[in-house]
Structure formats: structure tokens, C-alpha cells
Amino acid sequence: MNAVVWWQSLLLVMLGGAFGSGLRFVIGSCLLQRFGAGFPWGTLAVNLIGSFVAGFLLIWVDKRGSAGWPWRMLLIVGLIGGLTTFSSLMMECLVFVRSERSLMVGLYLCITLLFGLLFVFLGARLGAFVCDD
């Protein structure tokens, strides 16, 4: 990757990441207000939404061949990278353990992983359907 492409990629990732992080904040805030702090609905929601959209975008970007790299940087690496959050997932598991709600750790991880896999596959299926030439 030459220097110009590298800098363009960095700019696209930063742009997408800023928007994705802001979107994560908005979704998390809305769900916290709506459902309270008993369960990390915001993190679960952004990770599942991100899984679905990532599956869709992977197919959509791949259909564009070499012209898809800017979209991959902006949308997958930047936007979805900023939207989803593994570190928050792990931190929330630690909070459950420290508050003696260890059973919630297993439930939360199972829901996140199982539905995350389901959503990424559903997104990819939708992407294949929509982008089918």
C-alpha cells in the first residue's frame, strides 16, 4: 500500500469510526433511558446490529472488487469498528461478576455470541440477495 492510499485509508477509518462511536453513544443512551441499567442492552444492541451490518457490508464490498477498498475502510473498519465494542462487553461481564451476578455473565455471553453469529450470517445472506448480479 503506497503512502497516499494509506493516508486515504486512515482518513476514511477515522471518519467512519467517529460516526460509529457517536452512533454507539446514541443507541446506548436511548436504551439505558428506556430499559434502565439492569442489563447492558446498549452494548448488546450495537454488537448485534454491527454483526448484521458487517455481514451485509462484507458481501456488498466484495462485489465491488478493488473499487470496494474505500468502502471497506469507511464502513467496515471505521463505522462498524466504532459502533461495536468487545472491550465494553468484557467490562460489563466483570461488573456482573463483581456485583455477584455471575449467572448473568454466561447468559450475556451466550446471547451475544449466538445472536452475533446469527446476525452476521443473516446480514451476509441479505447482502448476497441484494447484491446478486
UniProtKB/Swiss-Prot annotation:
Chief site of localization: membrane
Record: residues binding Na(+): G81, T84
Activity regulation summary: Na(+) is not transported, but it plays an essential structural role and its presence is essential for fluoride channel function.
Domain of life the protein comes from: Bacteria
Topology relative to the membrane: Multi-pass membrane protein
GO biological process: cellular detoxification of fluoride
Gene Ontology molecular function, alphabetical: fluoride channel activity; metal ion binding
UniProt keyword annotations, A-Z: Cell inner membrane, Cell membrane, Ion channel, Ion transport, Membrane, Metal-binding, Sodium, Transmembrane, Transmembrane helix, Transport
Cell compartment(s), UniProt: Cell inner membrane
A single cellular component GO annotation: plasma membrane
Membrane-spanning residues: 3-23, 41-61, 76-96, 103-123
Catalysed reactions, as listed in the record: fluoride(in) = fluoride(out)
Stated family: Belongs to the fluoride channel Fluc/FEX (TC 1.A.43) family.
Function: Fluoride-specific ion channel. Important for reducing fluoride concentration in the cell, thus reducing its toxicity.
Protein name: Fluoride-specific ion channel FluC
Protein's organism: Xylella fastidiosa (strain M12)
